[in-house]
Amino acid sequence: MLKIDSLRIRYGNVEAVKGISLEVQHREIVALLGANGAGKSSTLRGVMNLSPKFGGKVFLRGEDISRLDTSEIVRKGCCLVPEGRKIFPYFTVEENLMMGDYGNSKGKTRQTKANLERVFSLFPILAERKRQLGGTLSGGEQQMLAIGRSLMLEPDIIMMDEPSLGLAPILVEQIFALIQEIRDKLNRTILLVEQNAHMALQIADRGYILETGRIVLSGTARELRENPDVAKAYLGMA
């Protein structure tokens, strides 16, 4: 589905991503883990052509998308749920969701309505609050809104950047359960950047560990959970 080959990203003289390669297969949940500053968010932004790549390539279903505009990448089926949610606070919930459909081809009103109903089915709380301003929602509800917005164009792969950031523990569990549901019921593929390694590895099929811009370890979620170095560094186990 998604293949990153020797990706390099630089901000000025600082090389944030140093030639990483990874793959995400159809209907997989793949976790990209690491400390702050490891290059996780830069990797996702690089896929979307939002960060300055100076080396490597990105392939979506075998097609080289490295030089495409962000809008073209989205239309080809790859979406990003950004860190911090980035909703429109003065738009209603429904208007925020419709922004996810912005740029869709004319004449797809029926499909747009179906997509909206699908999102409301997945997130009933958003249906209840569809006339409410996005900025008045709780943190968990805003995260649901950001994820729902990404679903409006029916992407094949969704990249999520720190979806549990700043949420209460009970909401974290809800968000991760919803991520699983999106994969299982909607057949979506997910690349998940997350500092909550424990929860991420509970739902992921595979994972990669990123340190200072390089992948230092990869394996199945079970292999990473049982790795003593990973347990000590990321799972809080001595």
Residue ranges of predicted features:
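Glycine-rich phosphate-binding loops of nucleotide-dependent enzymes
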Residues: 1-238
